[in-house]
Amino acid sequence: MFNLLKPKGASKRRKIVGRGPGSGLGKTSGRGQKGQKARNTSPRLGFEGGQTPLYRRLPRKGFSNSDYKLEYAIVNLGDIDKKFKDGQVVNYDTLLENKLIKKKNKKIKILSNGKLTKKVSFEVSKISKSAESLVIKIGCTIQLV
């Protein structure tokens, strides 16, 4: 097991360049004669050989409002039904305890996927219309925070 040999040709020998004409890769080291690709460094990303690059030829367009975008943690009624008991309060802290949301999301939106059979009270940011009608039908209370 520990003295097995690799099959012939399994590992290639490293190419050693610039060590005289007898090696086959001496003098120019397989880079050809002169020019940009024969030199030491490669041009930066987006460089077009002195021509005005595409990113400078085209105008800037649009803007992003992503810094101020409100992101809601989405929780389904089915998940709440699995993790909560009758009479419990569904809010940021209890959802975090039950690992239904991640810490970074402060705003919560409830959606109507799944069935809710337990009578719980909600303290959330938003709730969908279909989820609201299902929750009210059961007799749960909703408080928008």
UniProtKB/Swiss-Prot annotation:
Q: Name one GO cellular component term.
A: cytosolic large ribosomal subunit
* Swiss-Prot/TrEMBL keywords: Ribonucleoprotein, Ribosomal protein, RNA-binding, rRNA-binding
Matching entries from Gene3D superfamilies are given as:
3.100.10.10
Which ranges are annotated Gly residues under compositional bias?
19-33
Query: What Pfam families does the entry give?
Result: Ribosomal_L27A
Q: Annotated region Disordered: where?
A: 1-52
Q: Name one GO molecular function term.
A: rRNA binding
Instruction: Indicate the quaternary assembly.
Output: Part of the 50S ribosomal subunit.
Its family? Answer: Belongs to the universal ribosomal protein uL15 family.
**Protein name, per record:** Large ribosomal subunit protein uL15
Q: Which gene codes for it? A: rplO
